[in-house]
Amino acid sequence: MEDTKPRSLDFVERYHVAQHRAGSLPYITIIGLMIHPDFNQMVFNIRNNVDRLMREHPVLVAAIDDTDSRRLRWIINNNEPPFVTDQYLLHPVIDANRHPVSGPADVASIEDGEAQEFNLNQGPLWRVAVYKPKLRCPVTHYIALTVHHVVADSIGALNLFEDILRPHSVNHDPGLERSLPPKAKKTMRIQPSITGIIKKGVQSILNHKSSWKVTRGHGVTIKWPPPSLLKAPPRKPDVSHFSLDLRKDQHRVVERLEALGDHTGSIHSLLHTAAVIALTAATANDIFHTIDTETPKSLRSEDLTHPRIGGNYTGLIERSIPRWKLGRYTMASFTKKFNDYIHSPEGESEARSNMGELLLVPDRIIPNFWKSSLEKTATSGDPYRHSLSISNIGRFDPKDIVGLEKVWFCHASMP
């Protein structure tokens, strides 16, 4: 592998490490149902792709140094990674043991447990596993990719998933110089508000060591958590299943979700989205006149190019659409119109202005406001929040991936 220059973690990457250290490991799992006549050939192809990706993208073999300090740096493992890839040994990234499972929920449960074993100080911070469905034909398998958020966010994970499954004969663009992904601030065009700039400046001054002698820590709200306050990750995965019977529970959606929140301690925006969609679908009256959408938009600039594998920082585009307008379009034409706006200069400007500033990582516990927020949303006149086919996991283009039947997306809950 080519050598590359080390660099410190940016604010977003540090936030993911802080989540990990706080006992809420942020990861993404993508599961694909594959039908392939030759299991050995399928695994051989996956292995070749994984090894190539590890050579091309240093972040896939990197680790993180000195996680007990705020000055985190990537460990460059390009030439001598602490894990060995050998055709006669167990692969450090691929688990091809074909564990028998009943379905994708079982896969998600196992992957959750494996993700808890990710070692920030050593790596690798991603894995690929092959599972065998119990009730399907012998040529059917689940392929699971699990990636730590510090390596790639959801959009980067989808690109990685595609590259792992593509036939080895497909030509690949060598891309840019083989280096770690650049810092977020070097790849984004954002338009922070004046208030945000002032707030960040004051915050930085208060947190500077030279200011502590004068302020004695007054106003300091941000500090890297010391090892004594760390929370150990769960040793056993805890994957919960939750369902709503709209015929019985259409007036208890918020109550049921509150019960779920009391049990799990957090709720993911995907569950929020599913709940309000179900609430709208279960409502027979005409009180919902407008559909509100929020769609993540890449903040990468075309002139500030970056590797495909390495994540993608996003800002939100929010739109309100009168329901009567939907009758003028097919789903395809309406989605295209919405997509055109997202990729227009106006849409990009909206996402950049909503982004504001990337702030430092706080060490205090953030209050759990999701209950009151969801209660307010569910009782509003237009609680529908959905981004149609433009989702926060990006567009998945399975061309050249023969035998891929279905894809599931799993996400660790946010603290």
Identify the function of each model-found stretch:
Residues 1-189, 193, 266-287, 398-415:
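Non-catalytic N-terminal regions of enzymes
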Residues 21-36, 71-99, 125, 234-243, ...:
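Acyl/amide activation-and-transfer machinery of modular secondary-metabolite enzymes
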Residues 131, 146-148, 296-298, 391-393:
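Structured loops at beta-to-helix junctions and adjacent beta-edge loops in soluble globular domains
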Residues 172-225:
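Secretion/export-associated helical scaffolds and adjacent low-complexity Pro/Gly/Ser/Thr-rich regions
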Residues 203-265:
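Flexible, P/S/T/G-rich "lid" or insertion loops adjacent to the active sites of thioester-utilizing
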Residues 233-235, 354-360, 391-392, 397-413:
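C-terminal accessory segments of proteins
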Residues 268-269, 286-289, 347-354:
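Acidic/polar loop patches that form or flank catalytic/metal-binding clefts of enzymes
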Residues 313-396:
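Helical lid/core segments from catalytic subdomains that handle acyl or acyl-like groups
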